[in-house]
Amino acid sequence: DEFLELRTFESFPGLRRVLHDFIDCIALSPNKFVLTSRYVVRTLRLLRDRSARFEVVHLPGLTVEDTLDIVGMSAASDAADAEHTARSVQALADGRPAYVRALADELGTMREHGGGDPVSALAALLAPDGRLAKLCGFCYELRLHRARGYGALKAILEILGEEEGLTLTEISQRLRRTPGSTKDYLSWLEDVDLVTARQKRYSFSDPLLRVWVRLHCRPTAPSDDDLAREVHRYALPRLPQQEPALVMAVAGSSGIIE
């Protein structure tokens, strides 16, 4: 598990190529191994020119059917409602297993106390002491500390938190750095899977992490109005067609949505 952490030993004399030596060794072994890592880009780069014995298997996001198995029929009044809830949870969680599980557990807790819906569950989970707020914070810090240039990378993520789909030039202007140094920073963010580039425009790899950055990478803790506004902005384009009323209901209970 997390085999790339062997890089920790590279700071010791004689172990500067420990990760490459490890890969070369297991490539020659008659045994079979299963290696895992959360760092997709780094793994692909390491194995790119290695033995054909290595097969990279990407873990796909959860489907609606997978999500329904986790959420369970008990979370709804009938089969149609259960499927709709599963679709909403899967969309809000971007199919990510940890997020789906957190939403499913929060929905279960809410319904034990009289009701709840996926949007209000997401808002509760992103509150300062919420489960998803803590999980996103952990992933954010873990990945940043595995990259170089912590301060500059954090500034870029806050820029993309405000507006996604920016070009290298636009980011460098807002960062007030040269395009060359900004390109290096962006490559380091891509290296730990925090951002992706499509048609030379940069965005968060994890859309829910962007919501967390907007809410929690600021001088003060988010208010209920802040939570309602950001969850509304995130959820509205992702929910099934008939779901926006839920978003407005949650927004109305927590604050005014502009």
Name these PLM-found stretches.
Residues E190-K200:
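A short, conserved structural fragment
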